[in-house]
C-alpha cells in the first residue's frame, strides 16, 4: 500500500470511532487537558489516551505537556484532501445534537465556580464550543 493510501486509511479509521469523534468535538474550540475528556466522557484515562494516540498517528491531533498535564488540540493535516475531510467532519460534529450535549457538559464542568475534586489544579480549557 502506498504511503498516501495508508495515511488515508488511517484517517478514515480514526474518524470511524464514536469516542474519537467525541474527542475531536470537544477540541473544536481549542486545547483541552486529558482530565477534562475523562470527566466529560466518563471513560478511563487509559482508554482516552489510547484514542488520542490514534488521532495523533492519523495526523489530526497534536499534544503538548505542561508539567503533569497533557493538552491536546486539533492539528491541520498536511494533506489538503485530509484537511477538507476533517473540516467537513468538524462541521457535522458542530451540528450533531449528541455532540452538542457533550459540549454543554464540558462547559458545565470547566466553567463551574469550583472544579470536581478529580480536576483540582487542572488547567481549564481556554474556550468551550457552544
Which residues does each PLM region occupy?
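C-terminal regulatory/oligomerization modules of transcriptional regulators
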Residues: 1-5, 77-130
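Beta-hairpin "wing" of winged helix-turn-helix
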Residues: 57-66, 73-75
